[in-house]
């Protein structure tokens, strides 16, 4: 029985989707004004892992993740580079797709762009005005936050404290235009030569919060199963999404709110962020390291907990991947000489370990405990491989289970390419040298192959090779 921690209720709840066998899932995507950093990638990876596990459990997942392609940051960045906002968006949407592909993040069912939904955004705001939840002032439109009785509930915010904070951090001119300091913008009037669209209130552009309300309800319906995002989005973004959406539809907006923890760096575990300047972009990092190692590191901690990023932890993730790949390679290597049949004791133990994996993951996607079972499955496989005689069905079963569970973490090992003619010739030459007991030459050829990234291993079952 799958349980998830619901931020709205601050407790674990049994997961029951609106439609049996199908999950509607919306995850806030990036504001595409720059390359994503590792902290941004953590959110994408965490919810991709959750999605993959739901699919493993037999659910069809309708997964929508948006692109925020117009807001203050977009305008500022476009002006700095002397290009248009759409040009900036196109550049970094392409970069995002390249980065997430390298991290083996499954493409979303839909990746809507805010600017493709302006007509729906305007209609949504008009509906809120008609219901007296919003009001227009000099081309801007604001939401009456206090009118929504549950405002502040998601993030546990007190309205009086919010009023004081809003008054301290909002420009005096804007505060005077608002009916209440905690009201927030749904539509922003055009300023200067900013990108803008026609609306009943004059030319302008949407506020950030309204974009996600419109896109999630448009593509997934008035009520969705799971809404995900980083913990920094709880307030005000997700709080405002609830207020907007439920005021318009009169329905529960989201049944389960899931929020991932931050990526931290340094001895003081400081949150990684662009504003603090302590970030590393995925684009730069994957030029230097195996993207799969970064993916595995980001997948190895339960999604609600913070993850510390460091080069040593990244190297540890790569070591763990190498060991798992070696296990799978060894299972494949023994297959041609395996006897027919199966070892029922080993098969039963493997089934128990996969069942324990499911139990762990069913507890709010507890990947740490899940990985413990996966490593035990790899250990069982290695112990079985030590036997002089192995059975083909058992090898296949072990490899299939390992591959299936690793895929939940986005780990898919590519088959080694065939050796080219030159390397094949060197291997034959080495075998001839060994037969002639010319071990110095044999070792020299081995070292030459190693320099080309080919590792030779002499085993009781014969010589085998693998790429370093």
From Swiss-Prot:
What's the cofactor? Answer: Zn(2+)
How does the cofactor attach, per the note?
Answer: Binds 1 zinc ion per subunit.
Detail which positions bind ATP. Answer: 274
- Enzymatic class: ligase
Q: What is its main location?
A: cytoplasm
Which SMART domains does the entry mention? DALR_2 (SM00840)
Which InterPro entries does the UniProt record give?
Cys-tRNA-ligase, Cys-tRNA-synt_Ia_DALR, Cys-tRNA/MSH_ligase, CysS_C, Rossmann-like_a/b/a_fold, tRNA-synt_1_cat_dom, tRNAsynth_Ia_anticodon-bd
Residue positions of motif 'KMSKS' region: 271-275
Recorded GO cellular component terms are: cytosol
Please name the SUPFAM superfamilies in this protein's record: Anticodon-binding domain of a subclass of class I aminoacyl-tRNA synthetases, Nucleotidylyl transferase
GO terms for biological process, alphabetical:
cysteinyl-tRNA aminoacylation
Alphabetized UniProt keyword annotations: Aminoacyl-tRNA synthetase, ATP-binding, Cytoplasm, Ligase, Metal-binding, Nucleotide-binding, Protein biosynthesis, Zinc
Where's it found, cell-wise?
A: Cytoplasm
**Which residues are listed for Zn(2+) binding in this entry?**
28, 212, 237, 241
**Motif 'HIGH' region in this chain: where?**
30-40
- The enzyme's E.C. designation: 6.1.1.16
Q: Can you state which reaction this protein catalyses?
A: tRNA(Cys) + L-cysteine + ATP = L-cysteinyl-tRNA(Cys) + AMP + diphosphate
A Gene Ontology molecular function term for this protein is: ATP binding
Q: Which Gene3D superfamilies match?
A: Cysteine-tRNA ligase, C-terminal anti-codon recognition domain, HUPs
Source domain of life: Bacteria
Q: Which residues form the signal peptide?
A: none
**HAMAP family per UniProt:** Cys_tRNA_synth (MF_00041)
The entry's family comment says: Belongs to the class-I aminoacyl-tRNA synthetase family.
Assembly, per entry: Monomer.
Name recorded for this polypeptide: Cysteine--tRNA ligase
Q: What is the lineage of its organism?
A: Bacteria, Bacillati, Bacillota, Bacilli, Lactobacillales
Q: Which gene encodes it?
A: cysS
